Amino acid sequence: MARYAVEKSTHTGGAFSDLVFVDDRTPAASVYDVPVLQLADLEPGDFYCLAVGDGKTRSDLAARCDAAGLRPYSLLAPTFIAGPGVDIADGAVFCDHSIVTTSARIGRHFQCNIYSYVAHDCVIGDFVTFAPKVACNGNVHVEDFAYIGTGALLKQGRSDAPLRIGKGAIVGMGAVVTKDVPAGAVVIGNPARTR
């Protein structure tokens, strides 16, 4: 994700004068020819975008950045498509060819990898991660910190009974989810079952 953020940084419309990585644990002077700084080197009001796949780690880092007075920045790839009525919270990352169709709510620091989509009337929580090629059909509610693996398929819910993926749940690669997934559960297979 970090490399992707660097490669797509040229599509920010010239909004930024400097692009840096922030990592208090990395002794390297640069990564991908981009300077590496420590959090203390940044100024209140600077923007940040978290390039970390794990939602809990992203949450911890966001809390540190927010406490330092930094502002979350959403990174939208040039091929990202958002339909009408889409509400995207701060800090989201949408990679190339990702789509949110219509009337969906996207939580803080959501990461949507390449070729993933979120269909109509979905609610995606904070710090959720979609790996590449996730198919999230309409009327699905994904709670905070859930991780949806590559190629997973989330069945269409109903407006009166959305399909629910519980807080912190993990949906394995290629899983076909046809029923609600409880909070903290790990599901795999077709149809998806608790591991």
Summary of predicted features, one role per range:
Residues Q156-R164:
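Intrinsically disordered, low-complexity Ser/Thr- and acidic-rich flexible linkers and loops
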Residues S74, F80, V86, D90-S98, ...:
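A structural motif detector for beta-strand N-caps
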Residues G184-V187, P191-R195:
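Conserved beta-strand-loop-alpha-helix hinge in the C-terminal portion
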Residues L50, R58-L75:
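Glycine/small-residue-rich loop that forms an oxyanion/phosphate-binding "nest" at active or ligand-binding sites
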Residues M1-G55:
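A solvent-exposed beta-alpha-beta segment
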Residues A2-E7, D60-R64, I106, P182-A183:
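Short amphipathic alpha-helical segments
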Residues T178-D180:
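Solenoidal tandem-repeat scaffolds enriched in leucines and small polar residues
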Residues K56-T57, D87:
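Short alpha-helical
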